[in-house]
Amino acid sequence: MTKKQKKMLTRIIAAAVLLILLNFLPVTGIIRFVLFLIPYLIVGYDILKKAWKGILNRQVFDENFLMAVATVGAIAIAFYEKSGDFNEAVAVMLFYQIGELFQSYAVGKSRRNISELMDIRPDYANIEQDGSLEQVDPDEVEIGTVIIVQPGEKVPIDGVVVEGTSTLNTSALTGESVPREAKAGDEIISGCINLTGVLKIRTTKEFGESTVSKVLELVEESTSRKSRSENFISKFAKYYTPAVCYGALALAVLPPLVRMFAMGAAPQWNDWIYRALTFLVISCPCALVISIPLSFFAGIGGASHEGILVKGSNYLEALSKTKYVVFDKTGTLTQGIFEVVGVHHNQMEEKQLLEYAALTESASSHPISKSIQRAYGKELDRSRVSEIEEISGNGITAKVDGRSVAVGNVKLMNRLGIPYKSCHKVGTIIHMAIDGEYAGHIVISDVEKPTSKEAIAKLKQAGIQKTIMLTGDAKQVADQVAADLGIDEVHSELLPGDKVEQVERLLAEKPAKANLAFVGDGINDAPVLGRADIGIAMGAMGSDAAIEAADVVLMDDDPLKIVKAIRISKKCLGIVYQNIVFALAVKGVCLILGALGIANMWLAIFADVGVMVLAILNAMRTLFVKKL
């Protein structure tokens, strides 16, 4: 509990004890009134203060005003009737504050899930100077600086390990409890905790651009984006509260006047004013105003604990209505780790063909280029390469040792007018031409992720109507992967722009109430991520583009996290609708009973505080998503 919560709990206990003791004291009249005023003010002075400030600021109609009017009115009736029954007024304020304390604790609990993620923020970075370590502010570390991370410390800035081996705890970012190995040459992201060895890391980004900064910025902004349900409840409360206040006023005034002037009967002012005050307590919209945002907040907190970062409750709500999921193949359903599985050459020797291909691809960071460089396995002398030109969706041309080399797909060969040989093997075929003559081709294969097939099956179980895969790979390769994984629809041999067109087409074809989610690995996917109803970036650790463009960011590359994200969103929305129906139904029944004089102030307390506590308890279930 926070200091503020402990103080409130002390006030509640003190007021409750006094209320019980006062009922055993044989006092009447003004003394009884003064004595009961003590627990009333102990527990409710801040509510009265807020209500008065609201009146002064012309923001009258809120829950503080309702509670203040209802309790002061109840005291006035008891005082006027000389009944001495001030219990109801004190009890209303007491139970209302119990509900507020409960709500504060619930929000704090859900916020702690996000706060745990906030703990990834590093306090310092170690730099070696004159043989000793100096702690500096991460903001002061420039790109290219070698920092030292000791066991137990957080990695402050993204970089590459230049010396040392260790294991890293990435659970705060990914939700994955298994430590990750790190060695020289490995890329490493900020926010991880170094567990074992000392690591020397050469920074590749400034602190403000590092993964930890991007993630924290995303999480901090997530609570500001409200869902349609939250906006509806906010607007509802804006008009609902004044309406019930005027309704209560009408209930207090009109029936007595009708009795007096139309029926010639006694007006029974006290009875109708009491009904109106009961009506006010029942009508307090706390259960809705508190539990709906809390459901989304807890849902976002629970998701973040699992390495699923949702940029706002509006995206969580939209995700629950997803019926179409479109995948980019490479790095999403497959590992994106390509391997050369065959080199078919003409007159040039295999080693030389692979060398020329590796040199031509040496400036590219594409996974296929990296696989060719790995297959060559030797250090590349880039001074031998010049006039490099990358043709999007086709391949690369360059001069190697003065010779014209073209490395790419069938489209590149057709573009250059070079006859090529087809290959019977399933995989990505990289054709090569040297000095305008066909030199052979390299067969590269991507490996499917072990959980991709299970993820597709579970998505369908979760209510996804259609799964679609988009890829730039050859039709033969794409069809094989789609068949293996159980994908419903596949579109192959696409350029980056073609993927946007395909998503546009799917958006036009789908039903209006069904959302379309696009899942990519964040590399060259920004336009499509932004165009889909929901953009999901998977394996986004270290990818600025993914974090910027996506609506939902999965911090590791497990396709099953997509299923979990959708299940979390559905659970969250289900709880939101449960709370709305439950709160409105109970309040509706109690309001009718209150207006008819059947319900008293004690039932009103249940209709207000009881419903609020039950709704909050239900909302807190969105925190528990581990087993989804």
Residues covered by each model-derived region:
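Bilayer-spanning, highly hydrophobic alpha-helical transmembrane segments
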Residues: I12-A16, N231-M263, T278-F296, Y577-F606
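Short, hydrophobic transmembrane alpha-helix segments
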Residues: I20-F33
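Actuator/coupling domain of P-type ATPases
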Residues: G29, F36-Y124, E128, E140-I147, ...
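Juxtamembrane helix-loop transition segments at the membrane interface in multi-pass membrane proteins
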Residues: W52-F61, Y105-E116, L294-S313, T622-L628
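Conserved catalytic phosphorylation-site environment of P-type ATPases
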Residues: E63-T71, L173, Y274, C284-T360, ...
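Membrane-embedded transport module
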Residues: G247, E509-K513, A550, M555-L628
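P-type ATPase nucleotide-binding
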Residues: V340-K466, K475, D484-V503
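Conserved ATP-binding TGD loop and adjacent catalytic N/P-domain core of P-type ATPases
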Residues: G402, T428, I434-Q578
